[in-house]
From Swiss-Prot:
Taxonomic source organism: Synechocystis sp. (strain ATCC 27184 / PCC 6803 / Kazusa)
An example Gene Ontology molecular-function term: ATP binding
Record-listed E.C. numbers: 6.6.1.1
Pathway(s) it belongs to: Porphyrin-containing compound metabolism; chlorophyll biosynthesis
Gene Ontology terms: biological process: chlorophyll biosynthetic process; photosynthesis
UniProt name for this protein: Magnesium-chelatase subunit ChlI
Length: 357
């Protein structure tokens, strides 16, 4: 992937620039790390209404570099990576048939709350399959989201079964649709982003655990910052193009940083002692399973790559461990300390980090 950020064309819908978003650093970091390494497993963003969740996610999708896709392919198939090719494209590659390649923006797919399983996964036209002997597949939202971002607002209100389907595809990278003995399989590798307001209900713990990271966001309380945010939004709404032009240099720099991190990621290593200590933290917090250990290691590596380093430091782990573990702790109604502080406390003890005076 190469950096390809151009100034927004006058015909394309203008999106609020990612680098202009004030505060919400925890959410921004979680999103960036998932883009650098999608295997982290997505991010769940829980917080107050009107805190810029949707704005930030759209801004991230707009910031990302263009990707190469096979022309007229409904699955955004990669022309070079077999893991991201549909069956038809793979057959064409194997037979050395020339492919028409185009560049396109990373797709961001919004999943509506009322979506059905057929709309999400796609459907097979049985009549056509039986009468014409062809696999007539109508791709769903998972096909459209391949190699992009799938955003579910109010994910805590979505049907549990649909959340399961999304998490299975995000984890495995493939979507399988079966009906009447006919089976279709296509790549569905995307960054899953869910957001919601905890007042409207929590996700079941088994589903929550499947999200790689969990960011909590709060309404900005400082009056000066609130005024700055309101002024920025007003300026953007009145003159979007000049406003975006002010941030073009910062946007290009961040995009280049993301691309460099993606290229550097395979070379990043994490010391054995640090890995043992991460597992020690997870064990002490009584985290079920090993997802917490795996995701923390991946996120720390992605952060090191983002900072341009090939070795993970204690500071990298410190910045990601709360995001990776806070939603995996068992809820204790009598506990007065919140889960993030609990993770931080155990991390400092295990890693021997002393609070600065």
């Amino acid at each position: 992937m190469t950096a390809t950020l151009a100034a927004p064309s006058k015909t394309r819908r203008v999106v609020f620039p990612f680098t202009a978003i004030v505060g919400q650093d925890e959410m921004k970091l979680a999103l960036l790390l998932n883009v650098i390494d999608p295997k982290i497993g997505g991010v769940m963003i829980m917080g107050d209404r009107g805190t810029g969740k949707s704005t930030t996610i759209r801004a991230l999708a707009d910031l990302l570099p263009e990707i190469e896709v096979v022309a007229n392919d409904p699955f955004n198939s990669s022309p070079s990576d077999p893991e991201m090719m549909s069956e038809e494209v793979r057959i064409r590659v194997d037979s050395q048939e020339p492919l028409s390649i185009v560049k396109k923006k990373v797709t961001m797919v919004d999943l509506p709350l009322g979506a059905t399983e057929d709309r999400v996964c796609g459907t097979i036209d049985i009549e056509k399959a039986l009468s014409e002997g062809v696999k007539a597949f109508e791709p769903g939202l998972l096909a459209k989201a391949n190699r992009g971002i799938l955003y579910v607002d109010e994910v805590n209100l979505l049907d549990d079964h649909l959340v399961d389907v999304l998490l299975d595809s995000a984890a495995g990278g493939w979507n399988t649709v079966e009906r009447e003995g006919i089976s279709i399989r296509h790549p569905a590798r995307f960054v899953l982003v869910g957001s919601g307001n905890p007042e409207e209900g929590e996700l079941r713990p088994q589903l929550l655990d499947r999200f790689g990271m969990h960011a909590e966001i709060r309404t900005v309380r400082e009056p000066e910052l609130r005024v700055k945010i309101v002024e920025q939004r007003t300026e953007f709404d009145q003159n979007p193009h000049p406003f975006c032009d002010q941030y073009q240099t910062e946007q290009e720099a961040l995009q280049a940083k993301i691309v460099n991190a993606q290229n550097l990621l395979p070379q990043v290593t994490i010391d054995y002692d640090y890995r043992v200590k991460v597992s020690e933290v997870c064990a002490e917090l009584d985290v079920d399973g090993l997802r917490g250990d795996i995701v923390t290691n991946r996120a720390a590596k992605a952060l090191a790559a983002f900072e341009g380093r090939t070795e993970v430091t204690v500071d990298d782990i410190s910045r990601v461990i709360v995001l990776c573990l806070r939603h995996r702790l068992r809820k204790d109604p009598l506990e007065s300390i919140d889960s993030g502080s609990k993770v931080e406390k155990v991390f400092k003890r295990v890693f021997g980090v002393v609070d600065e005076a």
